[in-house]
């Protein structure tokens, strides 16, 4: 069974034709359509046309895709009545279990994953177009035992290894952290959340 990633821009441009061909060939494949609300390959522009996760789900069902699952970081923004018959609406945390389920299905299945692109989210926050959570996450190095469960749960690049005298531990790279907070799902008492705090700006380097 094959899992194939596809962005929403690619789907809108020509990717739907590949899905149609896979359905005709009865290929055992799951298309993971990433609805990230921006055309990443050309600079983060908005989609040039009417498209939404529920529209994609209905199109996939109309093309003959056997199972369609819509995963979202905010499932409450969608209504199951807007989905085609047989489609499922779940929180993004169910991704692993959904993939394990769909790999057992013969033929074409699809996951529509609805989450704004991390880079686009950061860009909008800087421009005041999206709320910026006034919370930051830190890891207490003295408590961390380096188990790595925070990285396993979040799969986040901002959870970085730190070499200490007591071995490798973990830290949050604040410069790249996108405030997704998935790392807090790690089974660990070392996390500290700070409300309303701001990062200290580094001192300017004097010119030589």
Label for each model-derived stretch:
Residues 1-41, 48-54:
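Thiamine diphosphate
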Residues 1-2, 7, 24-30, 63-67, ...:
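Short coil/turn connectors at secondary-structure junctions
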Residues 6-9, 15, 34-36, 72-74, ...:
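Fold-independent oxyanion-binding glycine-rich loops
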Residues 17, 24, 51-55, 63, ...:
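Conserved active-site and cofactor/substrate-binding residues in soluble primary-metabolism enzymes
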Residues 38-129:
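Glycine-rich ThDP/TPP pyrophosphate-binding loop and its adjacent helix/strand module
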Residues 114-116, 121-127, 145-202:
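Iron-sulfur cluster-binding cysteine motifs and their immediate structural context
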Residues 129-131, 206-208:
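Flexible, low-complexity linker/loop segments at domain and module junctions
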Residues 133-149:
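Short, flexible loop segments at boundaries between secondary-structure elements
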């Amino acid at each position: 069974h094959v899992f194939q990633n596809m962005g929403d821009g690619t789907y809108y441009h020509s990717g739907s034709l590949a899905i149609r061909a896979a359905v005709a060939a009865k290929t055992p494949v799951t298309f993971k359509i990433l609805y990230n609300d921006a055309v990443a390959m050309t600079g983060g522009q908005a989609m040039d046309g009417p498209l939404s996760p529920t529209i994609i789900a209905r199109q996939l069902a109309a093309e003959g895709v056997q199972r369609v699952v819509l995963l979202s970081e905010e499932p409450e923004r969608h209504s199951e009545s807007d989905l085609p018959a047989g489609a499922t609406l779940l929180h993004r945390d169910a991704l692993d279990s959904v993939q394990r389920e769909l790999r057992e299905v013969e033929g074409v299945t699809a996951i529509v994953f609805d989450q704004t692109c991390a880079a686009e989210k950061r860009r909008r926050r800087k421009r005041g177009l999206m709320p910026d959570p006034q919370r930051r996450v830190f890891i207490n190095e003295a408590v961390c035992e380096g188990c790595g469960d925070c990285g396993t749960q979040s799969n986040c690049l901002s959870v970085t290894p730190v070499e200490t005298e007591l071995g490798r531990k973990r830290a949050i790279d604040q410069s790249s952290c996108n405030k997704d907070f998935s790392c807090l799902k790690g089974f660990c008492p070392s996390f500290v959340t700070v409300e309303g705090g701001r990062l200290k700006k580094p001192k300017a380097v004097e010119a030589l």
